[in-house]
Every structure is written in structure tokens, then in C-alpha cells.
Amino acid sequence: MKKFLAILMAAMMIFTFAACTNEPAVDEEVNNDVVETPVEGEEVKEETPVEGEETPVEEEVPVEAEDNTIVMATNAYFQPYEYYEADKIVGIDAEIAEAIAAKLGKELVINDMQFDSILTAVQTGSVDFGMAGMTVTEERLESVNFTSSYATGVQSIIVKEGSAITTVDDLYAEGAAYKVGVQLGTTGDIYASDDFGAELVSQFANGNEAVMALNGGAVDCVIIDNQPALALVEANEGLAILETSYADEEYAICIAKENEELLAAMNAAIDELIADGTIDAVVAKYIK
């Protein structure tokens, strides 16, 4: 009986082994690529991503924003036309430029730079216009266009109190060789260099430096626009402004020659701001 049971168990094991080895093998890689097709009517559930696993997001194509700015070049050391209050440039030119930009539907951006770099910046197109108490001259008209005048200016002479220079005529007197300080690139620089010769004219980056040279004895007088001259004399004891002016002039905005559309638009804006009293109000705010 025991022998019969042993033979029976052996036969069952052989049958089981044969059944296992005859089952078709499924390739694991193939299984991984199989996509289950849902049975019709069966609810399809979206797979929730595992925490930490990146979920693919469709990238949005950025829309390029329209540039709605207009860029002004100035030299912000020309009070009260342009100067700093904290880190902001303010003054007559800054406010008038803001009003013009508003008329054009633009946001104003002001770039501060050396005065003698303004024309180049306008010519090369790195800025849209230059506004810095700038006078129209034949020399400047060769490289840029100018708008209508929006303000008038006077070139004044600053001297030390008790100076031998008491009138403008003293600078032209026979044998006179007074040293004149000017801001580089300004009409004061242009006129003085023409009148007295480059050897007698010392050029400085701004009016403050020119006045420091006057106080230090490096120059005998400083020629600069009247309004900045008033501010400089007020800030420095022992200085005075001659009663007679050196030159009278008008201020305008410089624009690249090829930008005639902007020139026409700014002239129209200036005319409107003069007509409605805006420019007079701005000037009166700074010049009492």
C-alpha cells in the first residue's frame, strides 16, 4: 500500500511540473508597454501623480510686451532744470518732459549722462531725445534737429566777491587774459572758447566742479546758465553774479534727424503745453 501511494505521489508531481513548464511566458518589457483599453461604459479614472513626481505641463509661449517708454538723455547737475532729489531726477526739464510724454501716451525714462554725450546718444538712437537746458546752435543743428523753444535762458558770469571782473566788457579788454571755467559741451563752453580762445577756457564735467575751481583760484570766473548760477552762488559763500549777462538764448529739445515723426509729435505737445499754461506753471514752480 505504501509503495502504491509513493508511485501515485510521484505521478502527481510529474504532472504538476509539466503543467508549469507548458504555460507560455510573458515578456516583462512587453507587459510594461501594454496600454489597457477601457471597456465601454467603464469609468476611466485619471492617475494621481505621486508626490515629488514631475507632472508635464504644457509650456505657454510668452507674449512680447509693447515697449511704451520714451527715453530722455540729460545731465542732472543743472539746477533747477534737472537735478537729484534723493535718487530721483526732478526739475523744470524733468516735469515738462513728463507732461510731453503723457501727451504722447508714453512712460518717461530719464538717463543721466555727461552733457557732451547727449548729442551722440540721440544720434545713435540709444535715447529718443535730449533735454538738458540745451540751446539751439548752428553747430548742433548739423547733427540733430531741435523742437520749438520751450524756455529762455541767460548765460551769466560768476566771480569771487571783490574780483577785478565787474562787467562782461572786462573779459574783452585789451591785454586781458582771464581764465574762464565752463561746463563741457554747453553753450557757455562754445561761446567762451570762440571769444577768448581754448587756451583760456577750462572745461569741467558740471557747474559744481567749475565753481570749486573758482574757489580754489584755478579760474577767474565761471560762465554758466543763470538759473544754475543762482543755485551755485547760494550754496557757496563769497561768490557773486555779474549784473550784465554774457549771452541770451532759447532752450529746445534735440531729436535725431531721421526721427521726423517724433519731432512733429513733440512740437505739437509743446504748443499745447504752452497754450494751456502748463509750461509757465512748471517754470514758476522752480524760478521765483
Region locations from a protein language model:
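Alpha-to-beta junction loops
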Residues: 105-107, 123-132, 176-179, 206, ...
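Extracytoplasmic small-molecule ligand-binding "clamshell" domains
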Residues: 29, 64-133
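A ligand-binding cleft/hinge motif common to bilobed small-molecule-binding domains
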Residues: 116-117, 132-142, 191-194, 215-216, ...
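Short helix-initiation/N-cap motifs at beta->coil->alpha
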Residues: 94, 109-122, 166, 184, ...
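Ligand-binding clefts/hinges and TM-proximal coupling segments of bilobed small-molecule sensing domains
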Residues: 60-62, 67, 187-204, 237-245, ...
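Periplasmic-binding protein-like
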Residues: 75-76, 152-161, 226, 230-271
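Flexible hinge/capping segments at coil-to-helix
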Residues: 147, 159-179
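Bacterial lipoprotein signal-peptidase II cleavage site
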Residues: 17-28
